[in-house]
Each structure stands twice: as C-alpha cells, then as structure tokens.
Amino acid sequence: MDGVTVIGHPLVQHKLTIMRKKETSTAGFRRLLKEISTLLCYEVTRDLELTTERIETPLVETDAPVLEGKKLVFASILRAGNGLLEGMLELVPSARVAHIGVYRDHETLQAVEYFFKAPDNINERLVIVVDPMLATGNSAIAAIEKLKERGARNIRFLCLLAAPEGIRNFQGAHPDVPIFTASIDSHLNEKGYIVPGLGDAGDRMYGTK
C-alpha cells in the first residue's frame, strides 16, 4: 500500500501477538508496549540524515557519523500515545516531546483541541506523531492538522495497528504524511474498534475501562 510501511520484523510481530492476547496483564502490556516502541522507533528513523564530526578516540582522531540537523520531535496523541514515548525516548534521549489533546467533532467534522504543547522551531524539525491505533483516523487527522497550523512540515505517523478505513481517511486528509505500522488489520467493527485488534490500548495500558 503506497505511503504505508508495515514493520514486519519478527520481534515486532511476536511482541504484538502477546499484546493482542486478552489474558496479557496490564503490567505485561505496558512492558511490551515499551519494548515494541523501541523497535518501531528504530524503523521509523532508519533514513535520518547523517553528517560527520571530528572526534578523538582513546587511540586516534577520526571523522565519525552523527545525526544532522535539529533534534527530533515525538508528538504524542493523548492519552494512549504516551505509552509509546518511553521506549522511543530511551533510544533517542535528546528528542523533544509534544503533547496533543485533540478530537474531531462528529457533527461539524472540525478538529477540537483541548491541549497542545510543542517545542519551538517545529517547522525545522522532523515530527514523529505517535498513537497506538489508527482506527477511524479522526484523532490523527486532527492532531496533524494542528501541527501543520503551527508550522510543522516534515511529519511521520507511527502506530501499532491500522485499519484500512483509517488509512483511507488519513491519506485523504494528509497524503504527504507517511504511515508506519506493525500491522494492517482486517476492519473496524460497529463500535469503531480495530478487528482483530487488541482492544482499547489506553485502557489496557492503564488498567481502566
């Protein structure tokens, strides 16, 4: 599917299967989410640009590769997106973090923002938006609209699971934003849950219903 990268690494798929199981505990789910987010982050940052820096090892001076440009921004869609941050920040501790509380009004189809906090110079940074689920796509669409309004131009979206319906909606609104996911599942049910899915990621992560 154009514009969508499915991360099929065996460790990602194995951990995702355990997360799907209804008997997986809250603690287990949370631990697996941290582990899988680190693996997903590795893939979504695979093509970051490098430059060289003159360094001194214990033996000699040498030119060595380092990341080029301003620090990354990880943008979490509240609340479930926060579950992906811990593992990603362990991998990229210098990254900046944005938090976005936003939803789409189902009657007006307008984005309703209740919280937004982002680093400065977001227009000069790669922004990786994270949310475990791309179901209808409404929250992700609205969040990215808000980021673009504030100047973000280089954006990627990372999730655990995506539904075909959500992908279509998302790409219709933001065809310039690539999607990275561990799985494209079958469909949405009548309640808007991804099938086969893993349930409500936020509830399973925090032990709520």
Curated annotation (Swiss-Prot):
EC annotation from Swiss-Prot or TrEMBL: 2.4.2.9
Free-text activity regulation comment from the record: Allosterically activated by GTP.
Positions bound to uracil: 194, 199-201
Cofactor dependency: Mg(2+)
Reaction catalysis annotation: UMP + diphosphate = 5-phospho-alpha-D-ribose 1-diphosphate + uracil
Binding positions for 5-phospho-alpha-D-ribose 1-diphosphate per the UniProt entry: 79, 104, 131-139, 200
Keywords: Allosteric enzyme, Glycosyltransferase, GTP-binding, Magnesium, Nucleotide-binding, Transferase
Note describing how the cofactor binds: Binds 1 Mg(2+) ion per subunit. The magnesium is bound as Mg-PRPP.
Domain of life of the source: Bacteria
Any single Pfam family the record assigns to this protein: UPRTase
Example of a GO MF term: GTP binding
Signal peptide annotation: none
Keyword GTP-binding in annotation: yes
Pathway entry: Pyrimidine metabolism; UMP biosynthesis via salvage pathway; UMP from uracil: step 1/1
GO biological process, one term: UMP salvage
Function: Catalyzes the conversion of uracil and 5-phospho-alpha-D-ribose 1-diphosphate (PRPP) to UMP and diphosphate.
Alphabetized PANTHER family for the sequence: ADENINE PHOSPHORIBOSYLTRANSFERASE, URACIL PHOSPHORIBOSYLTRANSFERASE, CHLOROPLASTIC
Family: Belongs to the UPRTase family.
Protein name (record): Uracil phosphoribosyltransferase
Organism (species): Rhizobium meliloti (strain 1021) (Ensifer meliloti)
Top-level taxonomy: Bacteria, Pseudomonadati, Pseudomonadota, Alphaproteobacteria, Hyphomicrobiales
